[in-house]
Amino acid sequence: METMDRKEFLSLLGIGSAALALTYCFGGCQPGNNGPTAPTNVDFTLDLTNSTNSALNSNGGYLYHNGVIVAKTVNGSFVAVSQYCTHAGGTVVYSPNVNDFYCPVHGSVFSTGGSVINGPAPSPLVKYNTSLTGTSLRVYS
């Protein structure tokens, strides 16, 4: 049976530790979202007379509901997109002064249609349909 001296042992230990560290470093560099994902099969209705939804009674107002941000744009139309930034999963906010969505985590900017205006977000926000009937706003996939 062959024995290992101290120098050889420490050398192999160092190589093994370096390989393990590199695996973790490069594993963390893989593209993709580490945060929550956009909701699928969305279908809900908001009663605009309910005080919980009062933010949508004013142009520039917005609210979050089940992973979706619903906003009433500065021109009075309703838009709905996933509330989670596609870069790191931060919660986006509606910016009425520039009529877009903004992620405060790393600065990504999205149009009201969800497309990326300014990264680092790699892909658009999922956009949902909206339909207003009287005082009921339906948001759906």
Description of each model-found segment:
Residues 15, 90, 108:
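Flexible cofactor-recognition loop at the NAD(P)H-binding site
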Residues 1-20, 24-35:
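N-terminal secretory signal peptides and thylakoid transit peptides that target proteins
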Residues 94-95, 108-115:
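Iron-sulfur (Fe-S) cluster-binding segments and ferredoxin-like electron-carrier domains
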Residues 31-97, 126-141:
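N-terminal pre-ligand scaffold of iron-sulfur
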Residues 99-106, 117-125:
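Short cysteine/histidine-rich metal-coordination sites, predominantly Zn2+-binding motifs
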